[in-house]
Amino acid sequence: MKARLLLIAYALVNAVLYSVLLPLWEGFDEPFHFAYVQQLSDGQGLPDARTARLSREVGASILLTPASQAVKQNLPQVTSYTQYFSWPVSRRSEARRRLRDIPTELRWQPSELLNYEAHQPPLAYTLLAAPERLLARFSLPVRVAMLRIIAAVAGSLLLLSGAERLFSQLEIPDPYGTVALFCLLSCQMMWATLAHIGNDWLAVPIAVWALVALNVLGKSPGRRSAAVAAVALAAGLLTKAYFLSFVPLLVGLCVVRRRWHELAITSVILCGLAGPWYARNLVRYGVLTGTQEARAGVDLPTVLRVAPTVDWPAVVWSSVRVSLWTGNNSFSTFSANTLNLITATSLAALLLWVASRHATAEWSWWFCWARGLTLWREASQRWRSAWRS
């Protein structure tokens, strides 16, 4: 119990510190995710991915906030960190003052900047919309910091509790489970993912809880476990479109075991909860996910056609490197030697795991982990191309 309380305290301290120390808009695509939250909080309804724009408040803040060179390639009008820190203290202080004094009424006025994150499912943004509305009278930097803290605290606690349950299913005893959780909470990429405004803070813990629910369904099939798994997956589908890749696993568990009642229950729940959002995408954009790539014609047949031409060793290494350490929108990373050492250690652990005996829960976790790695690469490519295109 003492170790668990220390882990919770460690998570809360990291959540708050990372949220307040991260520069404004340094989180992955953060101003665009925030604009989604702001549109919902202002009662303007769900955004249209083809026409949604940032508010003038957010647009003005982007011009007053320093950004990385990677962001400057996409938005040449922003000030780079190098330029910003070459200014005298008085000029930097004036820029911060102007940032704090941006009129809050500009939140109601659209800017010229398109919101390329408007295609995302709405659940995570809806949960942040109420706090954003309650904090509307505060300056933009304060609101962003508070929303980050809310997201990071909620996401880390959900992830911690879900990971504990998953470790229990995998029969990982203490102190190994505690050490693994400590390593997880010490991972920079975890906080880069959770401690910024977006939908990742909810998607990551939901993925873990979905695995927990799928393991329960696999071990103890029944109507209740099927309903819980379907609700967890529906929540994921309303947070990130990549949860579509988990649907075959849920359906497969029911079909392989010929649990037709459970299949009917899961189908009704998924269609009833997540179906309207994806039906909206089909009606509006003609594609299921609504993403920029899908709307541009990059579908599954296209991906399969070009797959043989991909340099897969480079893709795998890039995926590993991105997942180990990516310094937010600055895209900084560790040295190659450090990453090689971490990768070699992880590979050795994986080989030891392969050589051991496995329960069903472990194999379902492995399947979803492999799928998640592929989708993580896809996601990383999206936020790289979005800022640099």
Model-derived features with residue positions:
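Transmembrane-helix signature of polytopic, membrane-embedded enzymes
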Residues: 2, 138, 142, 163-186, ...
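Perimembrane helix-loop-helix junctions
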Residues: 216-219, 245-271, 278
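Membrane-interface alpha helices of multi-pass inner-membrane proteins
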Residues: 225-241, 246-252
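Multi-pass, polyprenyl lipid-linked donor-dependent membrane glycosyltransferases
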Residues: 28, 150-153, 174, 179-209, ...
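Transmembrane-helix motifs of polytopic, lipid-linked glycan transferases
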Residues: 145-171, 209
